[in-house]
């Protein structure tokens, strides 16, 4: 029997890191549009480079994709998804950090097909996000943000 295209593919594991960036209760989102084939609101994230710690990757990617210099407050968790390329099946794990920005400034990275960026209230951000796994991460991160805020710890960097 012939192998199906799916069975013929190599499975590749990839790791990315990203941030749920919050300023004054609002969440930073990016709008991606790749040649009109892919569009939607996403959280900033990207691939781990050699020798990088996950937190470093998350902070670097947030800065590269949005122009925002954020502080990593705490690790939120990971999401996983699978996608197909021409030759492989890629299993991607994304490690997420709750981050704090120091202003509403953001500038989407055009080279990565980001056309827009901005800070949105939780319920807006939740509904705008294209991927359910990113919605779940947002939910978890925002809950932790609320708890830190109630405890008087949000915005007080010396606690972390």
Provide a role label for each language-model segment.
Residues 1-2, 160:
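Classical N-terminal secretory signal peptides
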Residues 2-8:
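Acidic, Ala/Val/Gly-enriched low-complexity intrinsically disordered segments
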Residues 8-43:
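N-terminal strand-loop-strand
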Residues 18, 26-28, 55, 75, ...:
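A generic structural signal for ordered secondary structure
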Residues 44, 50, 159:
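Functional cleft and adjacent loop/helix regions within the main domain
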Residues 48-136:
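Unchanged
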Residues 130-160:
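Charged phosphate-binding loop/patch that engages nucleotide di/tri-phosphates or the phosphate backbone
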């Amino acid at each position: 029997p012939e192998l199906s295209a799916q069975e013929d593919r190599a499975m590749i594991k990839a790791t990315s890191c990203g941030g749920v960036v919050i300023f004054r209760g609002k969440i930073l989102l990016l709008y991606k549009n790749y040649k009109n084939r892919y569009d939607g609101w996403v959280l900033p994230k990207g691939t781990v480079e050699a020798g990088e710690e996950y937190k470093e990757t998350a902070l670097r990617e947030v800065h590269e994709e949005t122009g925002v210099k954020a502080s990593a407050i705490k690790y939120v968790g990971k999401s996983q998804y699978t996608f197909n390329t021409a030759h492989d099946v890629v299993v991607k794990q994304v490690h997420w950090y709750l981050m704090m920005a120091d202003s509403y400034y953001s500038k989407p990275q055009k080279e990565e097909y980001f056309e827009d960026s901005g800070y949105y209230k939780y319920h807006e951000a939740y509904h705008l996000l294209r991927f359910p796994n990113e919605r779940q991460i947002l939910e978890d991160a925002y809950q932790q943000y609320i708890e830190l805020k109630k405890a008087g710890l949000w915005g007080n960097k010396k606690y972390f």
